[in-house]
A protein has these predicted regions:
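Secondary-structure transition/capping motifs at alpha-helix termini
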Residues: 1, 66-68, 96-101
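Extracytoplasmic/periplasmic beta-strand context in beta-sandwich domains
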Residues: 2, 7, 73-75, 104-107
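Mid-domain, small-residue-enriched loop/turn segments at the edges of structured enzyme/sensor domains
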Residues: 16-21, 52-89, 105
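A penicillin-recognizing enzyme superfamily signal
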Residues: 34, 38, 83-88, 93-170
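Conserved catalytic neighborhood of penicillin-recognizing serine enzymes
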Residues: 2-56, 100, 114-142
């Protein structure tokens, strides 16, 4: 279990890139799970730099992001223009134990006589280890239980999520 520097503000890219947490909150050194719960920008930019932004781009593609992702430090903060469908693919892949399926609108068509006229052909692919997908999902459940989405859970079913902020009105 490692800890990440979630102090705010922090400077990256030889001092050229200033990153702050929302409200400039200073969280100190915390686990990655807690950084996710608190939506710590500084910890995630640090993580992205340490693992390499190109690996983040590659993983995004495996999880279902087809949009062009520019490999810069702010990418880990959600600055790329991805579609809601792509984000749904990412979260569906994690919830599906790391197995990716291309999205589809119609799973089956049955005629009046009951004959199956069409059935979707899934192209399932394990893109993330099942244990890793489970661990990530557990961390995202923590966002709803203990973090920035606290109070938005469901009493009768597990809920996972991730919050974020924007400076743009979209």
């Amino acid at each position: 279990d490692s800890t990440w520097d979630a102090t705010s503000p922090r400077y990256f890219n030889d001092g050229k890139y200033k990153v702050q947490n929302y409200g400039n909150h200073n969280y100190g050194h915390i686990s990655l799970a807690r950084a996710t719960e608190l939506s710590s920008n500084t910890a995630y930019v640090d993580l992205g730099e340490k693992i390499g932004i190109s690996k983040v781009v590659d993983m995004g593609a495996k999880l279902g992001i087809d949009s062009t992702l520019n490999p810069n430090p702010s990418l880990v903060l959600g600055t790329a223009g991805v579609t809601p469908m792509e984000m749904a693919e990412v979260y569906a892949t994690l919830a599906n134990g790391g197995v990716h399926n291309d999205p589809y609108g119609i799973s089956e068509i049955v005629g009046r006589t009951g004959k199956q006229l069409y059935k979707v052909q899934l192209n399932s692919k394990q893109v993330v280890d099942k244990k890793v997908a489970s661990a990530v999902t557990e961390v995202l459940e923590g966002v709803v239980e203990n973090g920035t989405a606290k109070g938005y859970g469901c009493k009768y079913q597990p809920v996972a999520g991730k919050t974020g902020t924007t400076s743009d009105v979209k």
